[in-house]
Amino acid sequence: MLQGHHRVMVVDDSPLACDFVKEGLEALGLGYEVMCFQDPYEALEQVGKVQPAIVLSDLDMPGIDGLELCWRLKESPSRQVPVIILTANDSEAERVKGLRAGADDYVNKSASMAELSARIESVMRRTSETERMRKLFARYTSDAVVEEILKSPDTVVLTGEKPEVTVLFADIRNFTGLAESLPPEQVVGVLNQVLGRLSDAVLTCGGTLDKFLGDGLMAVWGAPVHRTDDALRALQAAKMMMTAMVELRQAAQAEWAANERLGRPLVLELGIGINSGLAVAGNIGGSMRTEYTCIGDAVNVAARLCALAGPGEILAGERTRELVSHREMPFEDLPPVRLKGKQQPVPLYRVL
C-alpha cells in the first residue's frame, strides 16, 4: 500500500459522481486529497497548478470526453500524470479506445472504493517505477533515447544480446601536467567542466554515456537503443567535442592555459577514437555492483584508436567509415596500423 499524501483530480460533469468518488476515497483514510472538476476545460487549465498524483476522468462528458481529455493531458507538459478512465460502459471496444488514448487503466463505475483505491495504487506504483527509470537513464543518455526506451521497451538491447554498436573513446591530452601544477580543487573543477561539455555532446547526438575514465570517457551508440545513423551520430559528437575544447580553451585561458611552473603554455587537447562492430551488451559486474556496458573487439579497437590519436585528432575504424560512406563526412586514409590483439594491420582513417 502506498503511504503518504496523494492528490487526486476527479473530472466528471456530474456533481453527484464527483462527490461520491471524493467522499469514498477520503473515507478510506489512505491519505487521498481529492479535488473535483466538473468542467474538463478547467481541469486542463488547472492540472499544472494542482499537480495531481493521478487523474480520474469520466468517459462521457459534454465538450471534451474522457478520451479527449486523456489525450490532451498526455500531449501536455503534465503528460507524466497517470490517468484512469471511469465509465459505466465497460465494453472491450471502449477499453481499447481508452488505452489507445493513453489511459493507464480503465475502471467501471460500479467498482467498490476498495477496488478503485487498489487500481490507483497499482497505477501510481507503475508510474513511480517509470519515473525512477527515467531519472536513472537520464544520467547516461539523452531524453529522446529515454522516452524511446520507456515507450518501446521491446526495442531495448538487453543483457547477452550482440548488437552492432559504434563506440567512442575520448581522452584529454596533457591533463597530467595540469594536475601536477594546480591545486586539487582547481583540477577537479577543470575536469568537471571539460567532461561536462563532452557529455553534452554525447547526449545531444543521442548517445549513451557508458562511463568516465579518469580524464576521459566512453560513449556508445546502438545500445540500449539502435538507430540506423548511429555511426554518423558518433562522428558528429566527436566533432562537437573538438569544438567544445576550442571554446573552453578560449574562455578559460587566463585560468588554466598558462602554467608558470612548467615555464611554457599548457594546452589541453583531446584525442578521440571511434569504431563500429558487434559487441556484447548487458549488465556486467558482480553481485555487489553491475553496470550496463558493451564489451568485445569493437570496443577494444575504439580504445586503441583513441590511444593512437594525436592532440585534436579523431581516428575511425573501417566499419565506421563504411556506415557513413554515403553521407558527407570527409575522411583521410591513413596507413594501416598494428594493434594489440589483432593479427593483421587494421585500416585507419582520420576524420577531417
Curated annotation (Swiss-Prot):
Note on cofactor: Binds 1 Mg(2+) ion per subunit.
CDD domains according to UniProt: CHD, REC_OmpR
InterPro entries, sorted: A/G_cyclase, Adenylyl/Guanylyl_Cyclase_3/4, CheY-like_superfamily, Nucleotide_cyclase, Sig_transdc_resp-reg_receiver
Record domain Guanylate cyclase: where: 166-306
Domain Response regulatory residue range list: 7-124
GO BP: cAMP biosynthetic process; phosphorelay signal transduction system
Annotated positions of the 4-aspartylphosphate modification: D58
Cofactor section: Mg(2+)
Annotated Mg(2+) binding sites: D171, D215
Enzyme class: lyase
GO molecular function: adenylate cyclase activity; ATP binding; metal ion binding
Domain of life: Bacteria
EC nos: 4.6.1.1
Mechanisms controlling activity: Inhibited by adenosine and GTP.
Result when mutating D58Q: Decrease in activity
Keywords: ATP-binding, cAMP biosynthesis, Lyase, Magnesium, Metal-binding, Nucleotide-binding, Phosphoprotein
Family: In the C-terminal section; belongs to the adenylyl cyclase class-3 family.
Protein name per UniProt: Adenylate cyclase 2
Taxonomic source organism: Stigmatella aurantiaca
Gene coding for it: cyaB
